């Protein structure tokens, strides 16, 4: 899905998603139901420290969320200019890391 469009309010992995819609749709593909907004995702699963993060954890920031890939990177719907892509997990201050599986 890398390079697919960012669409505010979107939940389509092919036609466009925003950050929380992207995360929600990826996890739904694997049978895991998540709330729709970043703020509601801050309380799902179990909190872990960034040092304990493993691939598949979600990392939440102030108004943003991505899926941890390992090796210090997240996959996420970045913005309308960049679409879905990869960023360093520590590109900004982390609010919480949540383990869902």
State what each model feature region is.
Residues 1-55:
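Catalytic cysteine-centered active-site loop
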Residues 18, 63-64:
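Short loop/turn microsegments at loop-to-beta-strand junctions
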